[in-house]
Amino acid sequence: MNLSPRETDKLLVFLAAQVAQRRRERGVKLNHPEAIALISDAVIEAARDGKSVAEAMHIGTTVLTADEVLDEVPDMVSLVQVEATFPDGTKLVSVHDPIRH
């Protein structure tokens, strides 16, 4: 299988999100990279499902709560930016303050 660098990046985000989701299901509080992976994956999948950029941004803010991550993580994650492929092309989606206190 020959993947482009962009496809490899998407695959790594997916894999990291799967690991993070399994840990979250076990009740483990997520660290910074795990939180970023879950939020990024949710945005990428929203775009793939045909959602608008605004909808994808909103979905990114609903993925995690402060109770699901380590104490310092919400303050560390003030912005998540991810390139996602929408029906009308690839766009940079910015999710501000994605982890609500």
Curated annotation (Swiss-Prot):
InterPro entries: Urease_gamma, Urease_gamma/gamma-beta_su, Urease_gamma_sf, Urease_subunit. The keyword Methyltransferase does not apply. CDD domains: Urease_gamma (cd00390). GO terms for biological process: urea catabolic process. Its main location: cytoplasm. It comes from the Bacteria. It catalyses: urea + 2 H2O + H(+) = hydrogencarbonate + 2 NH4(+). GO terms for molecular function: nickel cation binding; urease activity. This is Urease subunit gamma. The gene is ureA.
